[in-house]
Amino acid sequence: MNEVYTDSSVALLLQRLQSTLGNCLVVADENWANVNWGLVRNTDQRSIHLISNRYDIAKSASTAGIDAYFNDFDFSALEPQSFDTVLFRVAKERATSHHVINNAAGLLRLNGRLILTGEKNDGLKTYVKQASKLFGDKASAEKSGAHYLASVQLHQQDAPALDDKNYAQTRPIITCDGLSLQSKPGIFGWDKIDRGSAYLIEHLPQFLERYTEAPTTLLDPVSYTL
């Protein structure tokens, strides 16, 4: 099912998906870039849906016949308590992982399962503990080489949510030449300005001077269904 460069934690989820039944939701970020979606199939006993913040991933999945959504992990179009399984390879950014785990609690039916994978350095064990507390479960991570997999079962839906830094909300980070530049959780390093970003901001006026008309549009990934 996996191509040569598929992330090993993603490969664990793909293996689990093969034996998973019911209504399944895959939450896919850049780690899923090299998956051959043509080999990830719906069956009479399994219906696969995908939500991704990467257009290429959502498009590939949609082309393979999978119900796919391209947006910034906006789950509002999905019916609450309608999934038996949610599969998520934890993200680089903590707020993103918390946001997905929180939403999984609302999307899963009671006794449904959130399947988490990642490496130790990704904080996988911490996320499993947090999800277990949120879900009212006592799950543990199983080791597979340098990667871990855990299955957290939903027993409650009224526990306090994890801190996702108000994930959906953009906020100003700096003003450049009278222009307020925005960022948000989910963008790695969103709450600080690194040297590369500072360089970009410093030279933004010169960049815009190249245009006879300044750019006025961008691709908005908030809600795009394939």
Regions found by a protein language model. Give the residues of each.
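Conserved class I S-adenosyl-L-methionine
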Residues: 20-34, 118-137, 211-224
